[in-house]
Amino acid sequence: MRPFELSSDEQFTYLHKIEIDITEKCNLSCKSCVRGCDNFKSDVMISLDKIQRFVDESIELNYQWERIGIMGGEPTLHPQLSEIINILYDYHQFNPSCHFWTRSNCIIPFDFPSWIEYQKNIDHSYHHAFYVSPQDVNYPMNKRTCHVLYDCGLMYSHHGYLPCCNSNVHIRAFNLIDGIQSLKNVNIESMMRLCEIYCKHCGWYMMDDFESGHLMEYPDTYMSETWRKAMDRYKLVT
């Protein structure tokens, strides 16, 4: 894989946007879910300690996040969602310019704070192929990583800091290594080392933009051999 081909300004933006997956549990089974909620189901929830560490490190390092998403799975299924929001509020006070947002298919079970954008009425029926391993279809791994990195930024989950929002499912499907455990060690180099491991399994690597590229040639329910074997293994142990 070639080096990250973004300008210094674009690299800065990538490293200052993040989605926090607070749960892997979902009450939908959308086909080709990039979080793996259809074929690689999991009920794992992030701990409050993990959220507290994220906030403490961000403040200690004076890390100026531009955007923080509270995601899943389905975030409203986390039984401590209100406590998570209370912890994140400390960072909101530290950096009021940071844009917090969340997306849900449910009704928020409490009065939602105005400092978090609550995205409702999302079309959950639209998905395209995801479970297509580039190595299965002889797609060359000779370009920079896909648009997801600079559109969505990093991911933070119970696995640590990860290079993109699709990373969690790769870890549990293929039993890959965890992410970076401390924010002070998050940089372009550490994220690209993880991309070398994760991207070879990801169908979105074959996208040029959100709706263009080689991946769009496959039906939305298509699953390549590497993913089928991973799914069979996963179902045997869960």
What does each model-identified segment do?
Residues 1-15, 126-128, 167-186:
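Short, charged low-complexity linear segments at domain edges
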Residues 133-238:
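Accessory C-terminal segments flanking Radical SAM cores
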Residues 52, 121-129:
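A short acidic, often aromatic-flanked loop/helix-cap motif at beta-alpha or helix-coil junctions
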Residues 1-104, 109, 220-238:
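Conserved alpha-helical substructure of the radical SAM core
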Residues 113-123:
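Non-cysteine beta-strand/loop elements that form the S-adenosyl-L-methionine
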Residues 79-82, 111-112, 165-166, 211:
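A short acidic (Asp/Glu
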Residues 104-105, 120-121, 166:
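Histidine-centered beta-alpha loop that forms part of the nucleotide-sugar donor binding/catalytic region
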Residues 31, 78, 122-125, 162:
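General alpha-helical segment detector with a strong preference for membrane-spanning helices
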